[in-house]
Amino acid sequence: MSFNLISSYLHLTKPLIIDNKSFPSRLMLGTGKYRSLRNASISIRNSSASIVTVAIRRAYNNKLKGKSSLLDGLDWKKLWILPNTAGCETVEEAIRIAILGREMARRLGQVDNNFVKLEVIADSEYLFPDPYGTLKAAEYLVSNNFTVLPYINPDPVLAKQLEEIGCSAIMPLGSPIGSGQGLQNLLNLQIIINNAKVPIIIDAGIGTASEASQAMEMGASGVLLNTAVAKATNPEYMAEAMKLGVISGRIAYLSGRISKQDKAIASSPSEGIFIK
């Protein structure tokens, strides 16, 4: 990245703030589906992500089986762990896994980390989140001092309800998890962004850097992705591309897009000397 771009970015943008916690990067990265732990570690480093999300069920299962884990290989003094409740189908299960996630963060030395990415998934084919279950679980977790980041369908009404009960950020999906279909419901996503008083993190469905940039150009506060990097032909390069996509999209949003016009508007003057 050029020095001028870095200077522009630092001048224009501020850190991402979630529940009074400051994060330099607006890109969050998942830890699943990588070909190897080394591959994952280098990709996370190349992305410059500040927040890394970990599926607590998978982490505990690996521990019980004696398998090595990214949890052991990452520097948790530099990275902020975002435990997630992926795989939970009920409110009760999501709450139980969230509590385990907070305990895991404590063991990694992040004693003030109450973050949880809340997922309640009742649809096994498309992995769409359960809106009712998400709202119920969020109410309980917020009341028990969790910093809740709920994963939801792009539903502006639900997003506002979750904000009003105390969720610290909202994570609407761009398209189904792992599908790589990009941002499918632009209207609803834009409404959610426009109406929000908390950070909006676009999560799921992003397939390449231009789509990460598009999310940021819309005014999203950040982007969370996993499959687009982990399953890329070269994950380590794709992580770098996603970092640059998020940065360029954020700069474009802050710079102010020109308005669309119905007709062409000449960029060169029509007045002046006529030359035969």
Swiss-Prot record:
InterPro entries: Aldolase_TIM, Thiazole_synthase_ThiG, ThiG. The keyword Transferase applies. GO terms for molecular function: thiazole synthase activity. It catalyses: [ThiS sulfur-carrier protein]-C-terminal-Gly-aminoethanethioate + 2-iminoacetate + 1-deoxy-D-xylulose 5-phosphate = [ThiS sulfur-carrier protein]-C-terminal Gly-Gly + 2-[(2R,5Z)-2-carboxy-4-methylthiazol-5(2H)-ylidene]ethyl phosphate + 2 H2O + H(+). Catalyzes the rearrangement of 1-deoxy-D-xylulose 5-phosphate (DXP) to produce the thiazole phosphate moiety of thiamine. Sulfur is provided by the thiocarboxylate moiety of the carrier protein ThiS. In vitro, sulfur can be provided by H(2)S. HAMAP family: ThiG. The active site is at residue 117. Keywords: Chloroplast, Plastid, Schiff base, Thiamine biosynthesis, Transferase. It is an enzyme of class 2 (transferase). This is Thiazole synthase. Homotetramer. Forms heterodimers with either ThiH or ThiS. Pathway: Cofactor biosynthesis; thiamine diphosphate biosynthesis. 1-deoxy-D-xylulose 5-phosphate binds at residues 178, 204-205, 226-227. One of its GO terms (cellular component) is chloroplast. Its EC number is 2.8.1.10. Coiled coil: none annotated. The keyword Plastid applies. SUPFAM superfamilies: ThiG-like. It comes from Gracilaria tenuistipitata var. liui. Belongs to the ThiG family. GO terms for biological process: thiamine diphosphate biosynthetic process. It is found in: Plastid, Chloroplast.
